[in-house]
Amino acid sequence: MLWTDCLTRLRQELSDNVFAMWIRPLVAEETTDSLRLYAPNPYWTRYIQEHHLELISILVEQLSEGRIRQVEILVDSRPGAILSPAEQPATTTAALSSTPVVPQRVKKEVVEPAATQSNKILNSKKRLLNPLFTFSLFVEGRSNQMAAETCRKVLTQLGASQHNPLFLYGPTGLGKTHLMQAVGNALLQAKPNARVMYMTAESFVQDFVSSLQKGKVEEFKKNCRSLDLLLVDDIHLLAGKEASLVEFFYTFNALLDESKQIILTSDRYPKELTELDPRLVSRFSWGLSVGVEPPDIETRIEILLKKAENSGVDLPRNCALFIAQQVVANVRELEGALNKVVAIARFKGSQIDLDVVRESLKDVLAIRARTISVENIQRVVSEYFRIPLKELIGPKRTRIYARPRQLAMGLARELTGDSFPEIGMAFGGRDHSTVMHACEKVQSLKQEDPIFNEDYKNLLRLLQS
């Protein structure tokens, strides 16, 4: 069934929480040339329309081989339709017991995929760009600002040698895929006929092996080497795939020879990819390599507020602050925490407040209470820099103690829910302004001093492991 196939693809494209909460409950009805989706209520319908209908429409057109080019989203007002508690009006029972009604259409519920959407797929189901991965929906902060600015610059100088290839590296879940696909989406917006291909390293291997088995290697080469923009995620996963590495090496060279833009992502800096062919690693460094780091607390707050706004959720700032203080690893975990808070609030039929947030994140809070505290941070920092704990906490202001102390204060603010005065008390009774200054100093030194930044990242990994 078409909708079943579409659900399989949507499960791959969306997070587990979003898929389970918003997509799975939809009821589908297929006609000769259209697909109707029924949602439980107007709020649900509006959310799907604003956030997922374009993606669904692209997939439906693709999976039906062009037969279905119209997708409708309808409010299912039939008796027995389920409403989420938070959205259920007081008159629901009376309304449903009245005369039978037909599904009510909401405004602008029909999406007609543009003919140019075929460029996003580029003859393969794996070439789909996520329409939500745009620059306007990307939240910038100190940790990712350079990467975002570089990606925008690439658009104005596509294929220029100084940033070709563009290599984005950093831990998983920080927005590297969002940024690289934002370049693809922006290019297609400006030039609908541009040839853009997005793929993971794993899908490159699968497609290449499939082309060998089917005797279509030349077609595979032509598709990959006639692009304007090639986007490859998790390039480090090519390790050990010798035949695929050789093919990618020649594809890479062919595109660069034609000044076609390549953007790659990895969890490590190019020179750390020792398991890949040294010739390929060397070429990764020909252009520009930009790191993406875990977001600081201010950026985490803005990410939460923007995600909530885009989902039509009222998230008070104090609740966003609380979530940001507890979830520090990456953006995906932030989104998962927010989804859980929203789900609990809807289930209870209540507004989001600190009580709901604490209940939703009780497992996270329990884990953090056992693992990360100011005292634990002080111990790890003193051991890392090999200085006595009493000197880290004490009054001495010499550089050998002051820098680690500032770093420990910054990490305490970043990783715990403690206030500035509480952190100050833990560091020998210092006042809140001293802690604030230390946190500001940490943020500036991370940008200015590579050694300090490396120490910060090492300590963050130690504390989160």
Swiss-Prot record:
Superkingdom of origin = Bacteria
Name one cellular component (GO) term. plasma membrane
Domain IV, binds dsDNA: where is this region?
346-465
- Region annotated Domain I, interacts with DnaA modulators sits at 1-80
Compartments (UniProt record): Cytoplasm
Question: Sorted alphabetically, which keywords does the UniProt record give?
Answer: ATP-binding, Cytoplasm, DNA replication, DNA-binding, Lipid-binding, Nucleotide-binding
Q: Where does ATP bind?
A: G173, G175, K176, T177
Q: A GO term (biological process) for this protein?
A: regulation of DNA replication
The role this protein plays is: Plays an essential role in the initiation and regulation of chromosomal replication. ATP-DnaA binds to the origin of replication (oriC) to initiate formation of the DNA replication initiation complex once per cell cycle. Binds the DnaA box (a 9 base pair repeat at the origin) and separates the double-stranded (ds)DNA. Forms a right-handed helical filament on oriC DNA; dsDNA binds to the exterior of the filament while single-stranded (ss)DNA is stabiized in the filament's interior.
Q: Kindly state the subunit structure of this protein.
A: Oligomerizes as a right-handed, spiral filament on DNA at oriC.
Q: Which family does it belong to?
A: Belongs to the DnaA family.
Name of the protein:
Chromosomal replication initiator protein DnaA
- Species the sequence originates in: Acinetobacter baylyi (strain ATCC 33305 / BD413 / ADP1)
